[in-house]
Amino acid sequence: MSNIYANSYLIIFVFLCLGVLLPIGALTAGRWLRPHVPSDAKATTYESGNNPFHDSRVQFQVRYYLFALLFVIFDIETVFLYPWAVVYDQLGLFALVEMIIFIVLLAIGLIYAWKKKVLRWM
């Protein structure tokens, strides 16, 4: 019986090693095989064949990052809510209480962001 478990872990270990070593090997082979000829033209912005008219490094305001961070947080909330809603009948009262606590904590975070005026654009 323990041989079955050992084989299961062996398969996981093999896939883990392949998942780490294959990308490292591909990146290393690409670095060794590619021609490396740096030039100023390669460092400029590609403007669909036109000459670039300004620097490609544009500074974004912090508001964009805050909106993106809030979107990711509440998007992941829906990822956790969907499987729970699908199997709600089988989980019982304990899972309902856990999910209510989860939603309340996220609501507290949303209220905090609202009070700090993170959601205000201008």
Swiss-Prot record:
> Gene3D superfamilies recorded for this chain?
NADH:ubiquinone/plastoquinone oxidoreductase, chain 3
- Per the record, GO CC terms? NADH dehydrogenase complex; plasma membrane
Cell compartments where the protein resides: Cell membrane
Keywords from UniProt, A to Z, are:
Cell membrane, Membrane, NAD, Quinone, Translocase, Transmembrane, Transmembrane helix, Transport
**Keyword Nucleotide-binding listed:** no
Q: Which GO terms describe its molecular function?
A: NADH dehydrogenase (ubiquinone) activity; NADH:ubiquinone reductase (non-electrogenic) activity; quinone binding
Q: Which InterPro entries match?
A: NAD(P)H_OxRDtase_bac/plastid, NADH_UbQ/plastoQ_OxRdtase_su3, NDAH_ubi_oxred_su3_sf
Has keyword Transmembrane?
Answer: yes
The residue ranges crossing the membrane are 10-30, 67-87, 91-111
Give the protein family. Belongs to the complex I subunit 3 family.
Q: How does it assemble?
A: NDH-1 is composed of 14 different subunits. Subunits NuoA, H, J, K, L, M, N constitute the membrane sector of the complex.
> Briefly, what is this protein's role?
NDH-1 shuttles electrons from NADH, via FMN and iron-sulfur (Fe-S) centers, to quinones in the respiratory chain. The immediate electron acceptor for the enzyme in this species is believed to be a menaquinone. Couples the redox reaction to proton translocation (for every two electrons transferred, four hydrogen ions are translocated across the cytoplasmic membrane), and thus conserves the redox energy in a proton gradient.
Q: What is this protein called?
A: NADH-quinone oxidoreductase subunit A
Which species is this UniProt entry from?
Answer: Geobacillus kaustophilus (strain HTA426)
